[in-house]
Swiss-Prot record:
Gene3D superfamilies: 2.60.120.20. This is RNA2 polyprotein. It comes from the Viruses. Disulfide bonds: none annotated. Changing R476 to G/K/W: No effect on viral yield and virus systemic transport. The lineage of its organism: Viruses, Riboviria, Orthornavirae, Pisuviricota, Pisoniviricetes.
Length: 1046
């Protein structure tokens, strides 16, 4: 047990301070269970103390202390402690007093504390040096977490002040300063001006404000009668503060450019470049010193731009990544008093240029570009000075006067070494000139014209012609300057749907025209702007119709002008009853970014205007619509279809059909199939265009569908239509269509178009591009676009409510698998045809087949296959039995204007069933680009194998237009590819079959208007036999039976 004397000695040891304890709890054990006591601010020098962190139950057991023997010393120390308790005013009033009262209780309780042995006490204690180190670390952390301050220097540190004390006092009394009225030479600083937010996108551009908008001088129509004040501002320093919202442990990096938008040259515009991490936590601070003088105007806050780039941003697109604010310090200047930079600014700040303040060891980089002139650059410059005096009216006689051009001064300074004289001047006088002969000046080395005083440069020197005569730039200017043609289209009062109103080559539109840009259109070699068509007409308000203007890259044969065929490349539908004018732009070169008049002439670009839907109410007279053709300053962009790459946006322009709803309360239903890989047409023939043929290359597809719906009747006829996606097994009597996800479109009087978007969430899986024409609607298993009258169709005039639906394109297109093909076609927009191979497979599509004549005229016969245009031409004998299939690969080759890539060909040669010893036949195969006898063969093959043989080879289509080729086009003398087969014994060599497939690098662009492709009802010739009346399902049986019999 402790004695009272021992307890008092503990107090004496406690008052002798050795090391302060901050936030350390000392605890003891006693029988009465007294809790912990905090002795913050106290002292402890005992070597045997048990210390615990503040998170635990802190317990300090006071060990066996050596008690003092002298009672006088004890009472002296007790009185001294009591005096400190009462007189101290700093910390003892709180911490020490609390501890002192605790020790008074401890003195009373020490009598009942157990007596511990010295060994157990030493095993529980720790050295007091640990407590000292923790106190030092706490002090360092407390000092390191101070609030961040602005790093921008003060104006008085950057400039030498020239303002009077009165101006300084007046500035202090004003909350808002009008910069135009501020005293010249007065520095200013604007802090924490919000710039904007950095978004999660590739590039973000933010304006750097120099001052608050309300401090900018406003435009005024009067001038105050006072001395001129501030006219410009010197921008000395800009501090950009970027508060990132990203995670503090992310690897997000940001690149930033401080750009002066006054310059157009990149080398002069970029003022500072810096890269910094975009982690959250402490903000990124960048201090730049532009040292730029800017005039006070309303555009002051738009001059400097901050361009942000996030290369590895993983934040959701469009979200806010960081918030940007700026601090700006500068000085007001005028024509009387300019700014005077301080020595600190010129020697330190201006030399530094820009600096990124680093926090927590972040990786930051900063660069300050410079574009100072060099001696080599100075030599390449040429300074031209040209000053002309105004014209003077001169009196010729009493009844006549004329204007005479005044004198002009021309002065040129050039550093080119090619010129003998870098500096030359000419003064020209226009009056009193005589027709004196030209003479050569040996000093100038030029021919002088004494009449006008001009210096005549020889034509072999390029300086005179470099600025004007060899100008190859595109046509530019206003609509009046770029208008090159105008076309009149007659809208007959008897116009009906399907009528062709205008169909001619685009080049022929210019013939006979005499507008400002007509000559420029015809004579410019390279035109980079798109062609704009503006159509205007004015019809009665109660009438309506629908016209379509379409542009296609070419035509072949007796091509079809059906709306399904012509709208696939560039087209626009227009209802003059709803909209009196319309315009659209197009690129006549679909696989390049430039074109010329000669190019569209020789490639035969076709322009067609047709009537899709006739008059709702016929006008009393014919109507004229005018088309104005011009070149706009909009860069041409190619539209290329890639086989290997899944395109983000696949333009289709597929005409889904014309929907007619009669007036009344009946709920009419119209359905349009989304198996859009095939053509459309009538019985025994089908129409094909390039985009639909291209999409049929895949067996299945999926994507986000974008439809354009156009009102094609009078605006006085109204209806509300519901559009939805469902399968074809729904009958017209099904009354719960709107239980599916649907869109309701209410067409107003002047509502002409609307866009419908069906995302991929509408479809659980992909679906087939083609469906067999014999399959019923209940069994095809593919989605349909439904259009149902929501309420009723009504109007103040008689007539039907007509809608035109066009599938504009597919976003995020995904093609799946290889399409084996279907031969057949339904009516418009139903089903398609054909076989094809996918990019990753070796599936060949049957394209063409030819059988030798049963009774050949000679021992040598030949046939030529046009591999691109899909034609078979027998040579010397017309009794060949030929058949052309309609697979998607053939449809693409025939309907695509421009093609590029590799085509793999498989030629199967089948012979008669004779003995090998009796075989006496050879086949010579020639791959040619032209059938002219002067052209050489590209490849030559010889087949002498008995029975049958298979030949595999490939060829590349590479053309002059960005690698694309237009087969047999007069432009650039382009050719096509032919495969000529010559058989020496046609009685033994009986059949040639050509199969083809595309390589994954194959690409196409542009559409060719083609005639309808016939559908053959005959079975293709069979091996060794020619049965025309058997079913396809029996072919394998017949062939197998024949083989067994043989």
């Amino acid at each position: 047990m402790f004695s009272f004397t021992e307890a008092k000695s503990k107090i004496s040891l406690w008052t002798r301070s050795a090391a302060p304890l901050n936030n350390v709890y000392l605890s003891y054990s006693c029988r009465c269970g007294l809790g912990k006591r905090k002795l913050a601010g106290g002292c402890c020098s005992a070597p045997y103390i048990t210390c615990y962190d503040s998170a635990d139950f802190r317990r300090v057991q006071y060990l066996y202390f050596c008690l003092t023997r002298y009672c006088c010393l004890y009472f002296f120390l007790l009185l001294l402690a009591d005096w400190f308790y009462k007189k101290s005013s700093i910390f003892f009033e709180t911490e020490f007093s609390r501890g002192f009262r605790t020790w008074r209780k401890i003195v009373k309780l020490l009598y009942i504390l157990p007596k511990f042995e010295m060994e157990s006490i030493m095993s529980r204690g720790i050295p007091s040096g640990i407590l000292e180190e923790k106190a030092i670390q706490f002090k360092r952390a407390k000092e390191g977490n101070k609030p961040l301050k602005d790093e921008i220097p003060k104006p008085e540190d950057m400039y030498v002040s020239h303002t009077s004390k009165w101006n300084v006092l007046r500035k202090m009394s004003q909350k808002t300063v009008d910069l135009s009225k501020a005293a010249a030479g007065m520095g200013f600083i604007n802090k924490h001006m919000l710039t904007g937010n950095i978004l999660a996108q590739p590039t973000t551009v933010l304006d750097i404000p120099v001052t608050k908008d309300k401090t900018l001088a406003m435009a005024s129509d009067f001038i105050r009668k006072e001395n001129l004040k501030t006219s410009a501002i010197h921008i000395g320093a800009i501090e950009i503060i970027i508060q990132s919202f990203a995670s503090p442990e992310s690897d997000l990096m940001g690149g930033f450019l401080l750009v002066d938008s006054l310059h157009t040259d990149t080398a002069n515009a970029i003022r500072s470049i810096f890269v910094a991490p975009m982690r959250g936590g402490r903000p990124v601070r960048v201090v730049t010193f532009p040292n730029t003088l800017a005039p006070v105007s309303c555009d002051l806050n738009n001059r400097f731009k901050l361009i942000c780039s996030l290369p590895n941003c993983d934040i959701v697109q469009g979200s806010q990544v960081a918030e940007v604010s700026v601090n700006v310090a500068g000085c007001a200047t005028s024509i009387e008093k300019s700014h005077t930079p301080s020595q600190l600014y010129t020697e330190e700040f201006e030399k530094e240029g820009a600096v990124v303040v680093e926090y927590l060891g972040r990786q930051t980089y900063c660069a300050q570009p410079s574009n100072l002139p060099t001696e080599e650059k100075l030599r390449s410059l040429k300074f031209d000075f040209h000053v002309e005096q105004p014209s003077v009216l001169k009196l010729s006689n009493s009844c006549n006067a004329h204007f005479v051009k005044g004198e002009s001064l021309k002065y040129s300074i050039s550093g080119k070494e090619a010129e003998n004289h870098a500096v030359h001047a000419t003064v020209v006088s226009r009056e009193g000139a005589s027709a004196a002969p030209k003479q050569y000046d040996p000093i100038l080395g030029r021919v002088l014209d004494p009449r006008n005083g001009n210096v005549a440069f020889p034509q072999m020197e390029q300086n005179l012609f470099a600025l004007s005569l060899d100008d190859t730039s595109s046509v530019r200017g206003s609509l009046l300057d770029t208008k090159f043609a105008q076309t009149r289209v007659l809208l007959s009062k008897a116009m009906a749907g399907g009528d062709v109103l205008l169909d001619e080559y685009l080049y022929d539109v210019v013939n006979g025209q005499d507008f400002r840009a007509t000559v420029a259109f015809l004579r410019t070699h390279v035109i980079t702007g798109k062609i704009k068509v503006t159509a205007t007409t004015n019809i009665s308000d109660n009438s309506g119709c629908c016209l379509m203007l379409a542009i296609n890259s070419g035509v072949r044969g007796k091509y079809s002008t059906d709306v399904y065929t012509i709208c696939s490349q560039d087209s626009m539908t227009w209802n003059p009853g709803c909209k009196k004018n319309f315009s659209f732009t197009f690129n006549p070169n679909p696989c390049g970014d430039s074109w010329s008049a000669e190019m569209i002439s020789r490639s035969r670009v076709r322009m067609t205007v047709i009537c899709v839907s006739g008059w709702t109410l016929s006008p009393t007279t014919d109507v004229i619509a005018k088309l104005d053709w011009s070149i706009v300053n909009e860069k041409c962009e190619p539209t290329i279809y890639h086989l290997a790459d899944c395109q983000n946006w696949l333009p289709l322009n597929r005409w889904m059909g014309k929907l007619t709803f009669p007036q009344g309360v009946t709920s009419e239903v119209r359905r349009m199939p989304l198996s859009i890989g095939g053509g459309a047409g009538a019985t025994q023939a089908f129409l094909a265009n390039m985009p639909n043929s291209w999409i049929s290359m895949w067996r299945y597809f999926r994507g986000e569908l974008h439809f354009e719906v156009t009102k094609m009747s009078s605006p006085y006829i109204k209806a509300t239509v519901t559009f939805l996606i469902a399968f074809g097994n729904l009958s017209d009597a099904f009354g719960f269509y709107e239980s599916f996800p649907h869109r309701i479109v209410q067409f107003a009087e002047v509502e002409e178009k609307c866009t419908l978007v069906f995302s991929q969430q509408e479809f659980v899986t992909a679906w087939s591009t083609q469906v067999n024409p014999r399959t019923t609607l209940e069994a095809d298993g593919c989605p349909y676009l439904y259009a149902i009258i929501h309420d009723s169709t009504t109007g103040t005039i008689s007539g039907d409510f007509n809608l035109g639906v066009k599938l504009v394109g597919i976003k995020d297109f995904c093609g799946i698998g290889s399409n084996p093909g279907i031969d057949g076609s339904r009516l418009l927009g139903a089903i398609a045809q054909g076989p094809v191979c996918a990019e990753a497979s070796d599936v060949y599509s049957p394209c063409m087949i030819a059988s030798t004549p049963p009774a050949p005229f000679s021992d040598v016969t030949a046939v030529t296959f046009d591999l691109i245009n899909g034609k078979i031409t027998p040579v010397g004998d017309d009794n060949w039995n030929t058949h052309i299939y309609n697979p998607p690969i053939m449809n693409v080759l025939r309907t695509a204007a421009w093609k590029s890539g590799t085509i793999h060909v498989q030629l199967n040669v089948r012979g008669a069933g004779v003995k090998r010893a009796d075989w006496d036949g050879q086949v010579f195969v020639y791959l040619r680009q032209s059938m002219n006898p002067e052209s050489y063969d590209a490849r030559t093959f010889v087949i002498s194998q008995p029975g049958s043989a298979m030949l595999n080879f490939s060829f590349d289509i590479i053309g002059p237009n960005s690698g694309f080729e237009f087969a047999e086009s007069p432009w650039a003398n382009q050719t096509t590819w032919y495969l000529e087969c010559v058989a020496t014994n046609p009685r033994q060599i009986q059949q040639f079959e050509v199969n083809m497939r595309f390589d994954p690098n194959f690409r196409v662009a542009g559409n060719i208007l083609m005639p309808p492709f016939p559908l053959s009802t005959e079975t293709p010739p069979l091996l060794k036999f020619r049965f025309r009346d058997i079913e396809r399902s029996k072919r394998s049986v017949m062939v197998g039976h024949t083989a067994t019999a043989a």
